Amino acid sequence: MNTLQKIAYRSKQQPLVPLGTLLTTAAVVLAAKSLKQGRKKDTQRYFRYRVGFQAFTLVALVIGGMYYQKESAEQKQTREDKLREKAKLREQLWIEELERRDQLIKARKQRLEESKKELMKVAQEGFEQERERELKKEDK
């Protein structure tokens, strides 16, 4: 964000501060002009305006600062709440992922057990067939 963008952003946040600054500047310029022309009464009046405009600017700055401080505290709280929600969501997703992986592992173990039982059954049948062949050979 460059300087002009910052000025525009801050002016939108606190529109009375730039107004007070412009009025103060105008009062100083008019006071200098009337001083150069020798109009003492006008010079005094413009300097009094300057003081009033500066006071207005300061009050606007302080009130705006207090307002935005309160607002930024609310935004910070909202941001923290969002971060907490995001953390809870991530935690929930992680738990779901762990449960999914656990189910996959259980399913694999179950398939392994079934395969093991089937292999044992096939092996047992093979051994029995082998014994029968040997017994037939011995009988002959």
From Swiss-Prot:
Keyword Coiled coil listed: yes
Transmembrane annotation, as ranges: 16-32, 46-68
Gene3D superfamilies for this protein: 6.10.140.1320
Domain annotation HIG1: ranges: 1-79
A GO biological-process term: regulation of proton transport
GO cellular component: mitochondrial inner membrane; respiratory chain complex
Pfam family, one: HIG_1_N
Keywords, in A-Z order: Coiled coil, Membrane, Mitochondrion, Transmembrane, Transmembrane helix
Coiled-coil blocks: 68-126
Membrane topology classification: Multi-pass membrane protein
Function, as annotated: Cytochrome c oxidase subunit which plays a role in assembly of respiratory supercomplexes.
Quaternary state and interactors: Associates with the respiratory chain complex III/complex IV supercomplex.
Name of this chain's protein: Respiratory supercomplex factor 1, mitochondrial
Lineage, top ranks: Eukaryota, Fungi, Dikarya, Ascomycota, Saccharomycotina
